[in-house]
């Protein structure tokens, strides 16, 4: 089966045909920034038209929460006016093929899980530490999406009850402490302001302030991992994202995990899929759902 996969992010929309895990005819456009609702309708219509007659189903990975085909977000700023956007209905105007939708981090999780031996690893988590902190959870070999599409929003678990207010409105979320956005919120106030990329450059040069800031992030992720392991019996975790894959970051996380009793720890690895994890994961997931549900029931 040939899939038209879409990956909708805050700044870009990627599209490609996915067949047998291989990407073909990939293209990328900017996410609309003005007249965003109408702009998104038009962008989706154009992408569907570009691939007309070349696919058997549509799989969409999107930032935010997918619930009954509607796109929303815990942090409305991430969608820039697309809150409560009828994503599935918008796509359905342009195709009669089956459509499946899920969160982009959930999709990336499913892609990463395809690389695991499911007989040995039945409980798996993917964590992305990037502009925000997100993830996905596989339990008993099944990706958890939840009844409202919010399963895996692990960046909005508690890290510090006295911490900064998160974009979701709660105080002290992991995302408000560990993310690239949280790092920049601090580093932009320094006497010599810098972005997260430069923070890590200074960290690797043993700059005291940069090191403290990166360590704060890594500690929050280490504690998140410990919470996930002890609450869900997670066997392996993959870490990705621009912060998560930054040189020296994963070793810091592992260092802090060593301070915990061993029952709180599991095997940690770097994520293997890059920018196309959402496309591939969404294509795999929707195909598996279609195969498991012959009547054509599609989640999202």
UniProtKB/Swiss-Prot annotation:
Reactions catalysed, semicolon-separated, are: an N-acyl-D-mannosamine + ATP = an N-acyl-D-mannosamine 6-phosphate + ADP + H(+)
GO molecular function terms here?
ATP binding; N-acylmannosamine kinase activity; zinc ion binding
**Where on this chain does ATP bind?**
5-12, 132-139
Q: Which GO terms describe its biological process?
A: N-acetylneuraminate catabolic process
Q: Which UniProt keywords apply?
A: ATP-binding, Carbohydrate metabolism, Kinase, Metal-binding, Nucleotide-binding, Transferase, Zinc
Give the domain of life: Bacteria
> What Pfam families does the database record attribute to this sequence?
ROK
State where Zn(2+) binds: 156, 166, 168, 173
Per its UniProt record, what InterPro entries does this chain match? ATPase_NBD, ManNAc_kinase_bac, ROK, ROK_cs
Report if keyword Zinc is assigned.
yes
Could you tell me which SUPFAM superfamilies the record lists for this protein?
Actin-like ATPase domain
Instruction: Give the main EC class.
Output: transferase
What Enzyme Commission number(s) apply to this enzyme? 2.7.1.60
Q: In which pathway does it act?
A: Amino-sugar metabolism; N-acetylneuraminate degradation; D-fructose 6-phosphate from N-acetylneuraminate: step 2/5
User: Assembly state and interactors?
Assistant: Homodimer.
Primary role: Catalyzes the phosphorylation of N-acetylmannosamine (ManNAc) to ManNAc-6-P.
Can you tell me which family this protein belongs to?
Belongs to the ROK (NagC/XylR) family. NanK subfamily.
Name by which UniProt lists this protein? N-acetylmannosamine kinase
Q: What is the lineage of its organism?
A: Bacteria, Pseudomonadati, Pseudomonadota, Gammaproteobacteria, Pasteurellales
Encoding gene, per UniProt annotation:
nanK
């Amino acid at each position: 089966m040939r899939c038209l996969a879409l990956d909708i992010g805050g700044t870009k929309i990627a599209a490609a045909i996915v067949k047998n895990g291989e990407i073909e005819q990939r293209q990328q456009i900017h996410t609309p920034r003005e007249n965003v609702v109408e702009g998104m309708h038009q962008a989706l219509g154009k992408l569907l038209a570009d691939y007309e007659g070349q696919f058997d189903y549509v799989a969409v990975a999107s930032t935010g929460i997918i619930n009954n085909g509607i796109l929303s977000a815990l942090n409305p700023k991430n969608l820039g006016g697309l809150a409560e956007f009828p994503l599935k209905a918008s796509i359905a105007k342009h195709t009669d093929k089956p459509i499946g939708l899920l969160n982009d981090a959930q999709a990336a999780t499913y892609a990463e899980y395809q690389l695991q031996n499911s007989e040995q690893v039945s409980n798996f988590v993917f964590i992305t530490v990037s502009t925000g902190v997100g993830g996905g959870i596989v339990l008993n070999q099944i990706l958890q999406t939840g009844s409202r599409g919010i399963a895996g929003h692990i960046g909005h678990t508690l890290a510090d009850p006295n911490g900064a207010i998160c974009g979701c409105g709660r105080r002290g979320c992991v995302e408000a402490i560990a993310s690239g956005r949280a790092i920049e919120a601090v580093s932009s106030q320094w006497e010599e302001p810098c972005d997260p990329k430069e923070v890590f450059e200074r960290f690797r040069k043993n700059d005291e302030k940069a090191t403290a800031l990166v360590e704060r992030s890594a500690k929050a992720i280490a504690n998140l991992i410990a919470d996930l392991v002890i609450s869900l019996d997670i066997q392996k975790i993959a870490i990705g994202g621009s912060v998560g894959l930054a040189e020296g970051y994963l070793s810091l996380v592992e260092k802090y995990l060593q301070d915990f009793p061993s029952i709180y720890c599991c095997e940690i690895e770097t994520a293997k899929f890059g920018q196309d994890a959402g496309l591939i994961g969404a294509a795999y997931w929707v195909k598996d759902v279609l195969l498991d549900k012959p009547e054509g029931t599609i989640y999202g």
